[in-house]
Amino acid sequence: MLPVPRASRRRSRLALIASAIVASAALVLTGCSAGAPAGQSSTGGDTGAFPVTVKSALGSTTIDAKPKRIVTWGWGAQDIVLALGIIPVAMPKFTYSGTADGVLPWDAERITELGGKTPQLLTFDTGEVPFEEVVAAKPDVILAPYSGLTQTEFDTLSKVAPVVAYPEKPWSTSWRDQTAIVGKALGMTKQTDALVKKTEDSVSTLAAKYPVLKGKTFYYAAANEPGKLNVYRADDPRVQLLNDLGLKNSPSVAALDSSKGDGSFFYQLSYEKLSQIDTDLLVMYFDKQSSVDAFTSDPLVAAMPAVKEGRLAAIVGESLVMATSAPSVLSIPWSLDRYVPVLAAAAEKVK
């Protein structure tokens, strides 16, 4: 099951370690070398862009000089940094969908292309920021534009290095905005603009090969809990990627949303309300085929028109699920050729 990013954190622990972090950070940064670590590429870009200020929902961050030691947190930021030809000094460890070492496949391929080594991997499964591990990485900047950082975490990390958080809500930054934010923070806006354009072109080209998708409605959900669906709202990046491919959000997504305004990127729907879903495609992710079979064997699920008529687009496999759940300029090209045919096969069944 794809881990759902956690909005809540254990705040008491922060209070206990905050002062220790400040002291440790001061010692670490005082002794920090200005050179990039072995295996890390030069950031290049426009050194004249600094100082630069990046605004976020948690506060403005000023970066005085071009960062050389980059730490990423959350989803996607490490993809963007790697796509720019830079290997972060530390990034999250992904036990779901990652390699044996905890590196996402497209990141592992890119690190190999760059001739580098796997960076320090940060404990990520708990959803809590591993502050001591971040301090040990000696960052010049911490990039977390697609994350669930709390205000307390942001403030604590800001004592270690400048922190770049999300512009509006946690876990809701589009892949385009993530890329632009990272580009600004690193003084590489020309490069990130080019990455966005290249990615948009690849999406448009593939969408044109599957005109059956254009204008079809979809309802994106996940069966992460017994008897309930997690339904992804319009501002979720995985939903926006389907919009890029020409699909339209089903009116059912908003019509069945009884918890609007709660600040989350998804809401829960009971199986008792499945019959109220009206959509061309039902798009869902699963870790393996047996999970698909278990889901569709439920009588309430089996009775859904989209399931009965083969209009369920089941995205199967942890790596493909992660790549399309956290789309980026690196994961989108890696996944599209596997993703779009599944969507098109379901769209062909629409009468």
Where are these regions (language model features)?
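Short helix-initiation/N-cap motifs at beta->coil->alpha
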Residues: 58, 122-130, 261-270
